[in-house]
């Protein structure tokens, strides 16, 4: 599902532990790290997509987490030209994302990256909240900065 402007609706997931660190996942067979994220299917709400992607990518169920916050609007990034599939219709030029800040309620051993036949990640670790800004691929960096900045007060509220 791609919107009229060429952006694919998507959810981004920032999963935190009790000490405010965030889950940072390594893309399978690559030295590239990112937050879990995934597309929103037709007739699926962002929250429904969040829980589906959370299960597909890190093996967690709704009862394993608590939603702390969500970005107010859509945050967009454009794909580099080399990643745009110019012969696909409709043309997708980037992603528009709703970002969710979650607190892990269950034991971290519940995190599993191998529950689907096509896992996206093969490893993960806890990192400091702002660490991903210096590590994520450049074309996603501004969206990460905006999401982390908007959601940070909710993490610091420590409720």
UniProtKB/Swiss-Prot annotation:
Its EC number is 3.6.1.-. SUPFAM superfamilies: Nudix (SSF55811). CDD domains: NUDIX_Ap4A_hydrolase_plant_like. A motif (Nudix box) lies at residues 38-59. Gene3D superfamilies: Nucleoside Triphosphate Pyrophosphohydrolase. Residues 6-149 form the Nudix hydrolase domain. Transmembrane segments: none annotated. GO terms for molecular function: metal ion binding; pyrophosphatase activity. InterPro entries: Nudix_hydrolase (IPR020476), NUDIX_hydrolase-like_dom_sf (IPR015797), NUDIX_hydrolase_CS (IPR020084), NUDIX_hydrolase_dom (IPR000086), RppH (IPR022927). The keyword Protein biosynthesis does not apply. Its cofactor is a divalent metal cation. Keywords: Hydrolase, Metal-binding. Accelerates the degradation of transcripts by removing pyrophosphate from the 5'-end of triphosphorylated RNA, leading to a more labile monophosphorylated state that can stimulate subsequent ribonuclease cleavage. Belongs to the Nudix hydrolase family. RppH subfamily. NCBIfam families: PRK00714.1-1, PRK00714.1-4, PRK00714.1-5. This is RNA pyrophosphohydrolase. It comes from Azotobacter vinelandii (strain DJ / ATCC BAA-1303). The lineage of its organism: Bacteria, Pseudomonadati, Pseudomonadota, Gammaproteobacteria, Pseudomonadales. The gene is rppH.
């Amino acid at each position: 599902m791609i919107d009229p402007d060429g952006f694919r609706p998507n959810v981004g997931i920032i999963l935190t532990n009790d000490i405010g660190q965030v889950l940072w996942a390594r893309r399978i067979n690559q030295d590239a790290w990112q937050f879990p994220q995934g597309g929103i299917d037709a007739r699926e709400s962002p929250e429904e997509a969040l829980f589906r992607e959370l299960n597909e990518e890190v093996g967690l169920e709704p009862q394993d987490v608590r939603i702390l916050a969500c970005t107010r609007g859509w945050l967009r990034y454009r794909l580099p030209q080399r990643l745009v599939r110019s012969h696909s219709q409709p043309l997708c030029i980037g992603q528009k994302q709703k970002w969710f800040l979650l607190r892990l309620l269950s034991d971290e051993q519940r995190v599993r990256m191998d529950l689907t036949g096509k896992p996206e990640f093969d490893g993960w670790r806890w990192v400091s909240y702002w660490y991903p800004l210096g590590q994520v691929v450049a074309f996603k960096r501004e969206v990460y900065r905006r999401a982390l900045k908007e959601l940070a007060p909710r993490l610091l509220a420590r409720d």
